Amino acid sequence: MTELHGQDDATALITRLRDATNAHDLEAIVACFAADYRNETPAHPERGFVGREQVRKNWQHILAAIPDLSTEVVRQSRDRDTVWTEWEHRGTRLDGSKHLMRGVVIFGVADGVAAWARFYLEPVVEAAGGVDEFVRKQVGSGRPS
């Protein structure tokens, strides 16, 4: 089967980003993103941003706050220049508390770097109650029909 244009770039980008993050190499992380990179966070629209410099600022803070941060790409799938990735980030914050985030990031890849992403990576909430409690909190306590 012939690889479609962009697939190799997309896969290589995810590998570079994971490796740079695990090495805590800020410059290598930033190099994975286009200068005009666009980050959309559909579940939190106010958190979206544009630009590689915000990527630098975010990762500089993350790496300083979680000195043992490690990342894993749990799964990925790609189609041409788009790659769907499932991530897990874990480590220990400076105050000793555990850091654990899981979720999906969908990347658009151009020229071997991330041009855009739809970001769904969230902190894991342990012991937050079961599904029934969650549904009630989200939609109210009306009676089921």
For each predicted feature, which ranges?
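Sparse recognition of residues in long alpha-helices and their boundaries
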Residues: P45-E46, T71
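Short beta-edge strand/loop motif at the mouth of beta-sheet-based domains
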Residues: E46-K57
